[in-house]
Regions:
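Short active-site neighborhood of thiol/selenol oxidoreductases, capturing the structured segment around
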Residues: 48-63, 83
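Conserved strand-turn element in the central/C-terminal portion of the radical SAM core barrel
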Residues: 55-61, 126-129, 186-191
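A generic fold-level signal
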Residues: 48-49, 133, 211
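Structural alpha/beta surface segment adjacent to cysteine/selenocysteine redox centers
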Residues: 67-159
């Protein structure tokens, strides 16, 4: 659905339109709830015993991942479900066609979702290509130290919040250290192979789930 320069690609985005029309004076019954309000995610009082699993397919160049990753980790912790983080390559690095219009929509949609959720989303420095590969090459090592999620979170913040050039040694160093890892150790491992097959397995699992 398109209205006055803004796309609404699903029912879950119509609250943006309702709020926009309300700000323009179109809401004549302000006491009446929105027809399609934003769905808040709450953990509730009942905790799982680990029998349920939350799978997170995380891409280091995805705006959506950047605003959802930390919240997904927190949700798993709060609810007691088992968290399974499954990193994947960005769409354009695995051959998924993406028009400029689609890219613009994704970035603008993420921005309005971030504002609604009060999630940081400010300066973007594109990590496409080598920065993503270099970070993923460190991921198995970070996981062995119990810092895999911290590494991904740190990279996403650098790329989508702080505007860090992760293509430089200085940028990657800040990512590593902000994740609580030792840069001198990381320098010896950057660029190593051994991570690609796991990401390919994750890609296939994601496609099998009907996701892209």
């Amino acid at each position: 659905f398109y209205y006055a320069g803004e796309w609404y690609w699903g029912v879950d985005r119509l609250y943006h339109l309702e709020n926009r029309l309300s700000e323009l004076g179109g809401d004549k019954q302000v006491q009446v709830p929105l027809i399609a309000p934003r769905q808040e995610i709450t953990s509730g009082d009942v905790r799982d015993n680990g029998s349920l699993t939350l799978e997170v397919f995380a891409s280091l160049r995805s705006p959506y991942t950047s605003i959802a990753f930390d919240r997904a980790i927190a949700l798993a912790k709060d609810t007691g479900v088992t968290l399974h983080v499954r990193p994947i390559l960005p769409m354009v690095m695995r051959g998924v066609p993406a028009t400029s219009e689609k890219g613009i929509y994704i970035f603008t949609d993420t921005a309005r979702e971030a504002r609604a959720a009060s999630v940081p989303y400010r300066r973007f420095y594109d990590p496409i290509g080598e920065p993503v590969r270099r970070c993923y090459s460190l991921y198995p090592w970070a996981c062995s130290l119990g810092k895999g999620n911290q590494l991904l979170s740190s990279f996403l913040r650098a790329a989508f919040v702080d505007g860090v050039n992760t293509n430089t040694e200085r940028g990657l160093k800040s990512v590593v250290e902000n994740a609580g890892l030792d840069w001198m150790d990381a320098k010896l491992l950057v660029g190593q192979d051994g991570w690609q097959q796991a990401l390919e397995d994750n890609r296939l699992a994601m496609y099998d789930s009907g996701l892209w």
